[in-house]
């Protein structure tokens, strides 16, 4: 009878003496070492991206890229890399980072030839796929196009005009609450109040149910969970870089490395959003001009989106439209308060334009050019989306900012590095709104290098809503109040964390900013 392979192996091993086993182990170790060295040498010298500059460790490993995401330092780390290596940097074995203004359109824009770039699978947003379906953020190109077309009506100018009353009601409440605090003559944490406002506003726009933050003057469990969802997503993305997507290793590392409370953040956010979305859908005849009202009233939107997709998109809109806007408004406040000449010109424009608060509307706030310039400059220096948004180059390759990049390469623009580069802006670290008003000193500025809402088919669908929200809140605040930063004591030290030339350099990013508190004093403008 023929011996099995197992029997032969056992007999062969029995014939080996200890010396032979030692030799075998040495041989295996040498072969593994040679293979690793060969792989390292190939990645450094022979890989299709070998011509692009970058640190040697980044060229051979995903570990540096993973680590800076997990620790919230990707934006500052990539800025240093671009300052050292130039406008294109190899930040991982198969990944390039760009800062040129043309790279935005080349990567994120509509492609003239071939398919648009797909979003990288390592990206994870505020909500994971459900029952095989995804929201607009994570959807592949074809499904994304269908969902975006269906949701476009929700964010049209016609819809925004109808939603104005909802947004104004929450700004009314913010102003009223701030007037109450003035009587107490104590510092106010503007960072929190902006968060309360954006959460209540988006809750009302998504589900016809505000979070209740403004009423109670504090964050709810749900609003806190939404803020932390970004951190959980960044940690998962960090793991995906080294462990792959949907692999056993990724699942194991998520279980071992991400705290259980982080999973609970996502759970609370999803469950609450799902419950409120279903309740709003069941009340379909309600004449409340929120997002779901417009979805149900528009035949194409209603027929194009499944119930699950509506739920997933409401989860996304709550997370994408709250803390991001609150962060920008807080940064904007810091910038105008630390630039007296900007503050005076801005308050003169707003207070000289309106005779009463009722005059501050969707139509009138569009006619405040200096306000728009200050917001654009704040969006440049303190973009709510400072992290790289990776895309995959289609098969066949593509030219990005003048460089041919092979297919299946991961690419992205580094937003924070781009806006801080002297290749794109004169005095890039300085807050100068005039650069957005045609000031000849900045004629060579590449304003397109600042894309806080991204661009192209996956650009922020809520850009117009966001701008109206920001203009409305800022106009109402400066029409009613004089704002000044607290500069002494513990609160003064906290405010220094916003200095982008100082401690602010160490502010962390988990997809969006992990913003610190900001303490201000308010005085009501006498009239």
From Swiss-Prot:
It is a single-pass membrane protein. GO terms for molecular function: heme binding; iron ion binding; monooxygenase activity; oxidoreductase activity, acting on paired donors, with incorporation or reduction of molecular oxygen. Its EC number is 1.-.-.-. It is found in: Membrane. GO terms for cellular component: membrane. Glycans are attached at residues 189, 420, 448, 464. Pfam families: p450. SUPFAM superfamilies: Cytochrome P450. The chain crosses the membrane at residues 26-46. Its cofactor is heme. Disruption phenotype: Impairs the production of abscisic acid (ABA) and leads to the accumulation of 1'-deoxy-ABA. Induction: Expression is persistently induced 60 minutes after the addition of the ABA precursor mevalonic acid (MVA) to the medium. Keywords: Glycoprotein, Heme, Iron, Membrane, Metal-binding, Monooxygenase, Oxidoreductase, Transmembrane, Transmembrane helix, Virulence. Heme binds at residue 460. Pathway: Hormone biosynthesis. The keyword Membrane applies. GO terms for biological process: abscisic acid biosynthetic process. PANTHER family: CYTOCHROME P450, CYTOCHROME P450 MONOOXYGENASE ASQL-RELATED. Cytochrome P450 monooxygenase; part of the gene cluster that mediates the biosynthesis of abscisic acid (ABA), a phytohormone that acts antagonistically toward salicylic acid (SA), jasmonic acid (JA) and ethylene (ETH) signaling, to impede plant defense responses. The first step of the pathway catalyzes the reaction from farnesyl diphosphate to alpha-ionylideneethane performed by the alpha-ionylideneethane synthase aba3 via a three-step reaction mechanism involving 2 neutral intermediates, beta-farnesene and allofarnesene. Belongs to the cytochrome P450 family. This is Cytochrome P450 monooxygenase aba2. The gene is aba2.
């Amino acid at each position: 009878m023929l011996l099995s392979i197992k029997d032969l192996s056992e007999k062969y091993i029995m014939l080996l003496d200890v010396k032979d086993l030692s030799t075998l182990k040495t041989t295996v170790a040498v072969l593994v070492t040679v293979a690793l060295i060969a792989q390292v040498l190939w990645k450094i010298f022979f890989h299709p991206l070998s011509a692009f500059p970058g640190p040697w460790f980044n060229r051979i490993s995903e570990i540096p890229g993973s680590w800076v995401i997990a620790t919230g330092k990707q934006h500052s780390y990539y800025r240093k890399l671009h300052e050292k290596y130039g406008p294109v940097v190899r930040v991982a074995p198969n990944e390039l980072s760009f800062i040129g203004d043309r790279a935005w359109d080349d990567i994120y824009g509509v492609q003239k030839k071939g398919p648009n770039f797909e979003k990288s699978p390592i990206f994870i947003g505020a909500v994971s796929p459900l029952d095989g379906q995804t929201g607009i953020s994570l959807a592949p190109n074809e499904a994304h196009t269908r969902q975006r077309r269906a949701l476009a009506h929700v964010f049209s100018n016609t819809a925004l005009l109808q939603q104005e009353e909802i947004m104004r009601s929450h700004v009314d409440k913010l102003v009223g609450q701030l007037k109450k605090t003035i009587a107490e003559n104590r510092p106010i944490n503007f960072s929190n109040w902006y968060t309360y406002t954006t959460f209540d506003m988006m809750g009302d726009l998504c589900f016809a149910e505000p979070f209740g933050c403004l009423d109670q003057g504090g964050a709810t469990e749900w609003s806190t969970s939404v803020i932390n969802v970004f951190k959980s997503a960044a940690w998962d993305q960090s793991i995906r870089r080294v462990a792959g997507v949907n692999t056993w290793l990724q699942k194991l590392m998520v279980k071992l490395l991400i705290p259980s409370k982080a999973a609970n953040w996502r759970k609370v956010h999803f469950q609450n959003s799902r419950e409120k979305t279903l309740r709003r859908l069941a009340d379909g005849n309600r004449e409340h001009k929120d997002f779901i009202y417009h979805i149900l009233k528009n035949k194409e939107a209603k027929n194009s989106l499944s119930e699950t997709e509506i739920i997933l998109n409401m989860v996304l809109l709550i997370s994408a439209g709250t803390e991001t806007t609150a962060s920008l408004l807080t940064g904007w406040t810091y910038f105008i308060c630390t630039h007296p000449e900007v503050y005076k010109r801005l308050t003169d424009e707003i207070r000289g334009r309106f005779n009463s608060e009722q005059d501050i509307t969707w139509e009138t706030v569009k006619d405040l050019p200096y306000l728009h310039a200050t917001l654009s400059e704040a969006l440049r220096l303190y973009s709510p989306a400072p992290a790289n948004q990776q895309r995959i180059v289609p098969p066949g390759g593509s030219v990005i900012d003048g460089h041919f990049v092979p297919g299946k390469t991961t690419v992205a623009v580094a937003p924070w590095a781009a806006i801080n580069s002297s290749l794109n802006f004169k005095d890039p670290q300085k807050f100068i709104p005039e650069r957005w008003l045609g000031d000849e000193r900045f004629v060579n500025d590449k304003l397109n290098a600042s894309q806080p809402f991204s661009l192209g088919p996956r650009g922020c669908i809520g850009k117009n809503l966001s701008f109206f929200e920001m203009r409305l809140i800022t106009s109402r605040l400066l029409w009613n109040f004089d704002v000044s930063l607290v500069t002494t004591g513990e609160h003064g030290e906290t405010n220094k964390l916003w200095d982008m030339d100082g401690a602010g350099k160490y502010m962390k990013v988990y997809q969006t900013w992990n913003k610190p508190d900001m303490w201000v004093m308010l005085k009501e403008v006498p009239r």
